[in-house]
Amino acid sequence: MVYARRRLSPIKPGEPIRYTDVELLKKFVTERGKILPRRITGLTAKQQRELTAAIKRARIMGLLYFVNKEG
């Protein structure tokens, strides 16, 4: 019988996701600027919603690029 390995969330459950924490947000965005899906990030549904809102807010504020400038 094969058991699925339980993934640990990369962000602690009680830890707030702030749009000003650009280094954290960059970990959840592809090189093309797309937000990674929950099945890849390993976040809970609530954390994924908060992360998406934070990334979008950071983009609007100019802290995070819509598309990666490198390459």
Swiss-Prot record:
HAMAP family per UniProt: Ribosomal_bS18 (MF_00270)
Pfam families for this protein: Ribosomal_S18 (PF01084)
Family the UniProt entry places it in: Belongs to the bacterial ribosomal protein bS18 family.
PANTHER family associated with the record: 30S RIBOSOMAL PROTEIN S18, SMALL RIBOSOMAL SUBUNIT PROTEIN BS18M
Superkingdom classification of source: Bacteria
Record-given protein name: Small ribosomal subunit protein bS18
Disulfide bond annotation, renumbered to this chain: none
